[in-house]
Amino acid sequence: MENHTAMKAWMLDPATKRLELCDKPTPKPRRGAVTVRVEAAMVLSYMKELLAGARGHTFPSRPFIPGTNGIGVIEVTGEGVYHAKPGQRVSIHPHLVADERCADPAQLLMGHPARFGEGAEDLQGDWLDGTFAEYVEWPASLVTPIDSLGAMPAVQVLGLSKAVVPYGGLLRIGLQAGETVAINGASGFYGSAGVLVALAMGASRVLAVGRDAKVLSEVARAGGDRAIPIPLSGDTAADTAALRKAAGGAIDAALDMISAGSSASTATVLRNLRRGGRLAMMGSCPEPLAIGFGEMLANDWMIAGQFMYPKEAPGHLVRLSASGQLRLAAIKPRCYALADLPKAMDEAPAMRGLEITALEM
């Protein structure tokens, strides 16, 4: 750190929405934090739209460095950090939840203009900056050691950030080894990774459900023999027959990751769950899901919303990756230099399936 007192970082002015590559002092870690040299940072498919203010999220009151997830090496640890060490390679995750004993602790996604829960504005004021920089200061509680993954390229390890979100949904519904699970939206960014995660968790069959037959086939091929592509036609009877045939009957559990304008595919998957089946909702479809009380009651269905994942989830995925159960090698990085962030944001919406957009430092 003595030789790196300055760094390059992208700064966003929340008033003008102007994004500029700047020289900034390299951050020094406060108590409970670490400074990480960033090797790779993830660019979300909607990042350009997000930073332009088109999604209606609440921005910080002052300029900040955007960027959510990353891979890097710890350079310095602050006081009160007991386990993280300089030189340790880590995965950086953004889901910060206030560590206090209350019913609804404040939470936010670091480097992402959105806040959730009372007190989140204060939380964001303390932890403003994200990963689109050569160095970041990050809470030690949100970096996960990845030494067990050896010399795997940072852009490949960044697949952990793609996988951990659907993992949170599958944990929410208690996916068990040997079960049959449907991933709705499996041709999308998170849904495709959900197929790999469900396989790693021991599902006997994973139905990769969606509209894009070509991408679904690619995702299923990457997953192996237990992954079955199910391209939907929009014909409820035909889609039901395809799901039932592939599952060998009813489905035990499902994860919904769709962002389409219609919830029709969600309803189709739901109605192919067995009695007592579970559905995790993690998508962003704006259309309500129409389901009657009687139908819910008669089938003992559980429908659960899930935002993000438990704090121990990234560590679980590192171990699943190190053992070979989670196939990070199936992730397809699209790489850009830090200075090329605008180009990366322009092209990120074109991602399909197991692709990921990454800045390489």
Question: Model-predicted segments: where are they?
Answer:
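Glycine-rich beta-strand-centered segment in the early N-terminal region that forms part
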Residues: 27-42, 55-108, 149
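N-terminal Rossmann-like NAD(P) cofactor-binding module of classical short-chain dehydrogenase/reductase
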Residues: 91, 254-255
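Glycine-rich helix-loop-beta junction characteristic of Rossmann-like nucleotide cofactor-binding loops
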Residues: 171-176, 246-247, 271
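Mid-domain Rossmann-like dinucleotide-binding core that forms the NAD(H)/NADP(H) cofactor-binding site
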Residues: 142, 147-234
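C-terminal hydrophobic helical "lid"/dimerization subdomain
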Residues: 1-7, 168, 238, 267-268, ...
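Glycine-rich phosphate-binding loop and adjacent beta-alpha segment
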Residues: 203, 218-221, 259-325, 360-361
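NAD(P)H dinucleotide-binding glycine-rich loop of Rossmann-like/cofactor-binding domains
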Residues: 96-182
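Short amphipathic alpha-helix with an adjacent loop that forms part of the alpha/beta core around
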Residues: 236-248
